[in-house]
């Protein structure tokens, strides 16, 4: 089913809306937990939903390698395979291919690489990505693109962006040929170069997509460059389509993305950091394995309503972490996922109440940090 995007309110550049799918409605701005292999690590779908998650991200590349398209089709699709009946967005595999480094070769046709699981030679292109994502039953399908690395010269970024545009057209054509009833998002590339981002936006909007992602950021560039590119790119994207910042990020990155007009985010950070004992709280980050928490009987965050904070102390979580108990990783993950969803809920409420700038100021004040200036404020 084609999603319906309703833009309900704006507060500066911050946007408040909703994505309406057959499988449910997603309030935006929204954060999507990452379920790489068809699971948010260590969590049942019910637990993920209880944290406030409305939509998940699945990984086309990894699910293609394991368990494969045939096993997926035996179950119906990814929703049935993992028992998550809400909306799912799948990335196209482009970023994972980018991450393979020396074991892949990119050509105009697609990408030749060795299967990191068993070493077999395999090939992925725009058409194959569209076919896999249709079999996954993705509510939002991402085009196959090349993630421009950082650093890249202007010429390198230009060639990469232009190839991604050609792949975008192939993705659109094959998506339509497959008669996929769901939704296809384009991905803006161009590295840190504003003129290349302009060309990418123009090319993608001429092809036409159901939503637009900003890709190729959070790959090593300075934060100032990410903010500058977002601030330049977002106003050029169609007002009536959702905007998705891929692979981002820290809580501060989500706030800065919303300040610049982003509606959707995803990142492994809350789950990965949870497993490493880095826990997000109102004032910043707690490293739970530090000795200072051994005798601290207070919860992680007095403002948090998650299962972990309602039932366990920092001392207990420290103990579980030091003993490498699986429960520790699970409780940490529940907390971090809930923190991210509470952050998005607070952002949505602030936009609804026309006080988003005040929210941003308070968010940074709790971290003893200055609010990063917008480009227009620097002029």
From Swiss-Prot:
Q: Which residues bind substrate?
A: 91-95, 145, 189, 216
* GO molecular-function term, one example from the UniProt record: metal ion binding
What residues sit in the active site? 91, 266
Q: Does the keyword Transport apply?
A: no
InterPro entries annotated for this entry? ArchSynthase1/Queuine_TRR, TGT, TGT-like_sf, tRNA_ribo_trans-like
Task: Please list the residues that bind Zn(2+).
Answer: 304, 306, 309, 335
Q: Where is this region: RNA binding?
A: 247-253, 271-275
Provide this UniProt record's keywords sorted from A to Z: Glycosyltransferase, Metal-binding, Queuosine biosynthesis, Transferase, tRNA processing, Zinc
Q: Which GO terms describe its biological process?
A: queuosine biosynthetic process; tRNA wobble guanine modification; tRNA-guanine transglycosylation
Pathway(s) served: tRNA modification; tRNA-queuosine biosynthesis
A Gene Ontology CC term for this entry? Answer: cytosol
Reactions accelerated catalytically: 7-aminomethyl-7-carbaguanine + guanosine(34) in tRNA = 7-aminomethyl-7-carbaguanosine(34) in tRNA + guanine
The UniProt entry, under PANTHER family, shows: QUEUINE TRNA-RIBOSYLTRANSFERASE
Quaternary organization: Homodimer. Within each dimer, one monomer is responsible for RNA recognition and catalysis, while the other monomer binds to the replacement base PreQ1.
Instruction: Give the UniProt family note.
Output: Belongs to the queuine tRNA-ribosyltransferase family.
Q: What is this protein called?
A: Queuine tRNA-ribosyltransferase
Organism name: Vibrio cholerae serotype O1 (strain ATCC 39541 / Classical Ogawa 395 / O395)
């Amino acid at each position: 089913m084609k999603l319906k995007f309703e833009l309900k309110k704006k507060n500066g550049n911050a946007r408040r809306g909703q994505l309406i799918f057959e499988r449910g409605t997603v309030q935006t701005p929204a954060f999507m937990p990452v379920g790489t292999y068809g699971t948010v690590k260590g969590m049942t779908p019910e637990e993920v939903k209880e944290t406030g998650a409305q939509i998940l991200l699945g990984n086309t590349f990894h699910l293609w390698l394991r368990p494969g398209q045939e096993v997926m089709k035996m179950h119906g699709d990814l929703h049935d395979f993992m028992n998550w009946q809400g909306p799912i967005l799948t990335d196209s595999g482009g970023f994972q291919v980018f991450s393979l480094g020396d074991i892949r070769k990119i050509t105009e046709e697609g990408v030749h690489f060795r299967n990191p699981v068993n070493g077999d030679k395999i090939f992925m292109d725009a058409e194959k990505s569209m076919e896999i994502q249709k079999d996954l039953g993705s509510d939002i399908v991402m085009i196959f693109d090349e993630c421009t690395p950082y650093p890249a010269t202007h010429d390198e970024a230009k060639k990469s962006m232009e190839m991604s545009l050609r792949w975008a057209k192939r993705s659109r054509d094959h998506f339509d040929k497959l008669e996929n009833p769901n939704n296809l998002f384009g991905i803006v590339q161009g590295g840190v170069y504003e003129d290349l981002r302009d060309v990418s936006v123009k090319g993608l909007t001429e092809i036409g997509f159901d939503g637009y992602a900003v890709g190729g950021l959070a790959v090593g560039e300075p934060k100032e460059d990410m903010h500058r590119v977002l601030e330049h790119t977002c106003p050029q994207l169609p007002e009536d389509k959702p905007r998705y910042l891929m692979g981002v990020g820290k809580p501060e990155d989500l706030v800065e993305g919303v300040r610049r007009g982003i509606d959707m985010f995803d990142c492994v950070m809350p789950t990965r950091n949870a497993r490493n004992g880095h826990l997000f709280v109102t004032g910043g980050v707690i490293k739970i394995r530090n000795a200072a928490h051994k005798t601290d009987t207070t919860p992680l965050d007095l403002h948090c309503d998650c299962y972990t904070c309602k039932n366990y102390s920092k001392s207990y979580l420290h103990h579980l972490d030091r003993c490498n108990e699986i429960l520790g990783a699970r409780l940490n993950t529940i907390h971090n996922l809930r923190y991210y969803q509470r952050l998005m809920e607070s952002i949505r409420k602030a936009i609804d109440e026309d006080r988003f700038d005040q929210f941003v100021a308070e968010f940074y004040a709790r971290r003893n940090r200055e609010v990063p200036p917008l480009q227009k404020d620097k002029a």
